[in-house]
Every structure is written in C-alpha cells, then in structure tokens.
Amino acid sequence: SGLQFAVLDGQGFIPFPRV
C-alpha cells in the first residue's frame, strides 16, 4: 500500500514496503 513493515532478521529489523 505504502506502509512499511519491519521484520526481525538475524542482524536486526529490516523494513520492507508492504503491498
């Protein structure tokens, strides 16, 4: 949509555009 969703990765939080 335009919002960003943060996911917990091995190195930390990686924000990616949620569609």
Swiss-Prot record:
GO terms for biological process: neuropeptide signaling pathway. Mediates visceral muscle contractile activity (myotropic activity). Its main location: secreted. It is found in: Secreted. One of its GO terms (cellular component) is extracellular region. The modification Valine amide is found at residue 19. Belongs to the periviscerokinin family. It comes from the Eukaryota. This is CAPA-Periviscerokinin-2. Keywords: Amidation, Neuropeptide, Secreted. It comes from Striatophasma naukluftense.
